[in-house]
């Protein structure tokens, strides 16, 4: 994890999408990649809560797009789970890895599992044939369909 701690007031601004408030805190010296006790960054929190304007500002401020939390998750993994295609586009345009392993699964796996077709299309556009569910996940889905 990053050594800069993320103050709870900043984390709350990210969750709420208070872009101006966060921009001020960053200008005043808050590290853009500061992490809370669970390893979540401002980018992870804003992404997971669907705050596209805040995500765009954080990316412009050079937030690390693939920095993982304590569970090994990236912002794109969270977005694939939640279904925010607009934020997935922002993250992918900033270099997010659509095949980043998230504890045995990838953003493609999450999008498949939760039926996020629009995100699957984005991921496939970026990675082509490589953007397929992992072998383990494909076997799990096959087993679930047979049960």
Q: Where are the regions that the model predicts?
A:
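Ankyrin-repeat boundary/linker signal
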Residues: 35, 68, 100-101
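Ankyrin repeat A-helix N-terminal signature
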Residues: 12-17, 45-51, 78-84, 110-116
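Ankyrin repeat structural motif
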Residues: 18-26, 51-59, 84-92, 116-124
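Hydrophobic packing within well-folded, soluble alpha/beta domains
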Residues: 22-25, 32, 42-46, 55-58, ...
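Ankyrin-repeat inter-repeat connecting loop/turn
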Residues: 32, 65, 97-98, 130
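Ankyrin-repeat-protein effector appendages
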Residues: 1-12, 94, 103, 109-147
